[in-house]
UniProtKB/Swiss-Prot annotation:
Function per UniProt: Peroxisomal docking factor that anchors PEX1 and PEX6 to peroxisome membranes. PEX26 is therefore required for the formation of the PEX1-PEX6 AAA ATPase complex, a complex that mediates the extraction of the PEX5 receptor from peroxisomal membrane.
Keywords (A to Z) from UniProt: Disease variant, Membrane, Peroxisome, Peroxisome biogenesis disorder, Protein transport, Signal-anchor, Transmembrane, Transmembrane helix, Transport, Zellweger syndrome
Membrane topology value: Single-pass type II membrane protein
Gene: PEX26
The name this protein goes by in its record: Peroxisome assembly protein 26
Peroxisomal matrix side: 268-305
Localisation per UniProt entry: Peroxisome membrane
Species assigned in the record: Homo sapiens (Human)
Disease: Peroxisome biogenesis disorder complementation group 8: A peroxisomal disorder arising from a failure of protein import into the peroxisomal membrane or matrix. The peroxisome biogenesis disorders (PBD group) are genetically heterogeneous with at least 14 distinct genetic groups as concluded from complementation studies. Include disorders are: Zellweger syndrome (ZWS), neonatal adrenoleukodystrophy (NALD), infantile Refsum disease (IRD), and classical rhizomelic chondrodysplasia punctata (RCDP).
Length: 305
């Protein structure tokens, strides 16, 4: 029983030392489950390299935040926790080579691009520009920069410059980049001049590439046309030589018979009529001349051989 009395007489101890009977007991604030899940996801990502489990843990943390938001959000949860969950999730998706899903995965929790944290948006720009797909974030970043609430953030100027260098200039949107730099008060005078100089350099390079491509196309076009005109006589000559050689390879009587049949079919004249005798006589003379030319040509070739 002494132990019971001594226990009851002992002062209660709290975080700040022994409590007096007149002092109220201070309740320790409950830690949000999302914070524990965030630490678990970071551990899975960095230490265990289990990217799929890290992504699933981030999604469970977001679900926990959504459930607590229905009632009263416990102390300890903040925008930094949500931003950190997005950072871990983006890195996990990138490690699994699912970087195309990053933007849609983030927007399912923030609903609209204007609500994205600057750090998350910067990470998206860096990822998609590194994968040479800056056009995927063009509309999202543009909507974020046009939102009046975001223009008062301290990160606005750096993010706008990052957007110009990583998205607009690689895509060739030089007019949009110049309009953003000139119309934004977030750029200092020195930074504005530097970015405008970069835009001017990109525009000159674009003009040189365009003029160079046009000059390269002209010789190719002229060369192709001249090649066609030069190759056309050669093709006709080859066809003519092939037809003549094929014609000479036929016997003379067969050639004459084929010509007569062709005349009967095409010209439709009667060989027995007196008016056709002159034509047949001329045709026979033509065949004799062709035959002499063929034999004389073969004779010359034999002499040369």
């Amino acid at each position: 029983m002494k132990s019971d009395s001594s226990t009851s007489a002992a002062p209660l101890r709290g975080l700040g030392g022994p409590l007096r009977s007149s002092e109220p007991v201070r309740a320790v604030p409950a830690r949000a489950p999302a914070v524990d899940l965030l630490e678990e996801a970071a551990d899975l990502l960095v230490v265990h390299l289990d990217f799929r489990a890290a992504l699933e843990t981030c999604e469970r943390a977001w679900q926990s935040l959504a459930n607590h938001a229905v009632a009263e959000e416990p102390a300890g949860t903040s925008l930094e926790v949500k931003c950190s969950l997005c950072v871990v999730g983006i890195q996990a998706l990138a490690e699994m080579d699912r970087w195309q899903e990053v933007l849609s995965w983030v927007l399912q929790y923030y609903q609209v691009p204007e609500k994205l944290p600057p750090k998350v948006l910067e990470l998206c720009i860096l990822l998609y520009s590194k994968m040479q797909e800056p056009g995927a974030v063009l509309d999202v970043v543009g909507a974020w920069l046009q939102d009046p609430a975001n223009q008062n953030l301290p990160e606005y100027g750096a993010l706008a410059e990052f957007h110009v260098q990583r998205v607009l200039l690689p895509l060739g949107c030089l007019s949009e980049a110049e309009e953003l730099v000139v119309g934004s008060a977030a750029f200092g005078e020195e930074r504005r001049l530097d970015v405008l100089q970069a835009i001017h350099t990109a525009r000159q390079q674009q003009k040189q590439e365009h003029s160079g491509s046009e000059e390269a196309q002209k010789p190719n076009l002229e060369g192709s046309v001249s090649h066609k005109f030069l190759s056309l006589p050669m093709l006709v000559r080859q066809l003519w030589d092939s037809a003549v050689s094929h014609f000479f390879s036929l016997p003379f009587k067969k050639s004459l018979l084929a010509a007569l049949i062709l005349c009967l079919l095409v010209v439709r004249f009667d060989p027995a009529s007196p008016s056709s005798l002159h034509f047949l006589y001329k045709l026979a003379q033509l065949f004799r001349w062709i035959r002499k030319a063929a034999f004389s040509r073969l004779y010359q070739l034999r002499i040369r051989d």
